[in-house]
Amino acid sequence: MGFLYSQLFKSLPYPTGNYSGKTIVITGSNVGLGKEAARHYVRLGASKMILAVRSLDKGHDAKHDIEGTTKCADNVIEVWKLDMASYDSVQKFAARVVTELPRVDIFIANAGIAPGSYRTAEDNESSITVNVVSTFLLAALVMPKMKSTAATFKTRPTFTITSSDVHGHTTFPQKSAPDGQIIATVNDKATAEKIWDDMYPISKLLEVLGVRSIAEQNPASKFPVTINCVNPGLCHSELGRDFPTIGFWLIKFFLARTTEVGSRTLVHAGSQGEDSHGQYMSDCEIGTPAPFVTSVEGKETQDRVWNELVKKLDAIKPGVTSNF
């Protein structure tokens, strides 16, 4: 009932505010929620908007579209290459952020995939690489720039991950794997294909657990950057285009929010202060994650998963998790 009420009856506030002087980065912003969130931020006066995209051509199409509707100056929006399926691309992009941008006030890690079948990217099933490993690698790599932004400009930046309420739609059977083997079990092809419909929810659950881990180890009172995650609800977007079931498309047709309305949740989450640190944002307010997340078993699983993820991230870029 909560999902139906949220989708059909919850009114989300139209974004307001003044982002003059702010630099904002949004990944996965050539289409969908990321593009519409970028449009809102530019409309509200953002001084610099970085569209981080896999396809530069599509990114430039998005740039021209946003410029056409907002009438912003032609130097506000920049299009940068980022392929979340490649650790090398993530590191090169983050290096540009650190060296070329004077400040980063808001970072919306919106890029994500929901593949229709098993395939790999780097050393994981593709949705685990894109939605989880590369997302937290990116967070760790840009955190020094966001911390310096806080110190230099006396502000509190925000790093927001686009998650989903489907994080509660899985029992996460791989949690019973031996210590140090949860992510490896998630990546196992035979295991994944048996519960394929759970794979995207599992990736979203791992995002929620990761955000909570960072915040628990780095409380807002001692950490100058707010890190949260946001559930935009079911929206009309490119995500899910690989889903073949007619049931999914019928549900989307009748219940999905427009892309613009869904994007309001991203803009809201990115503008929140320390009260949202470590929180799961939903319907433009602090929400409640799935019961498993806050259970004793959920906390134990969170700690185990985070320990594994830290080792994986530090193997990609030695010492990178010390940036948190």
From Swiss-Prot:
What SUPFAM superfamilies does the database record attribute to this sequence?
Answer: NAD(P)-binding Rossmann-fold domains
User: Which residues participate in NADP(+) binding?
Assistant: L33, K58, D83, N110, Y200, K204
Active site feature: S163 (proton donor), Y200 (proton acceptor), K204 (lowers pka of active site tyr)
Oxidoreductase is among the record's keywords? yes
Q: Name one GO molecular function term.
A: oxidoreductase activity
For this chain, the family text in UniProt reads: Belongs to the short-chain dehydrogenases/reductases (SDR) family.
Which PANTHER family does the entry mention? PHOSPHATIDYLINOSITOL-GLYCAN BIOSYNTHESIS CLASS F PROTEIN, PHOSPHATIDYLINOSITOL-GLYCAN BIOSYNTHESIS CLASS F PROTEIN-RELATED
Its biological purpose: Short chain dehydrogenase; part of the gene cluster that mediates the biosynthesis of the dimeric xanthones cryptosporioptides. The pathway begins with the synthesis of atrochrysone thioester by the polyketide synthase dmx-nrPKS. The atrochrysone carboxyl ACP thioesterase dmxR1 then breaks the thioester bond and releases the atrochrysone carboxylic acid from dmx-nrPKS. Atrochrysone carboxylic acid is decarboxylated by the decarboxylase dmxR15, and oxidized by the anthrone oxygenase dmxR16 to yield emodin. Emodin is then reduced to emodin hydroquinone by the oxidoreductase dmxR7.
What protein does this entry describe? Short chain dehydrogenase/reductase dmxR8
Could you tell me which species this protein originates from?
Answer: Cryptosporiopsis sp. (strain 8999)
Q: Which gene encodes it?
A: dmxR8
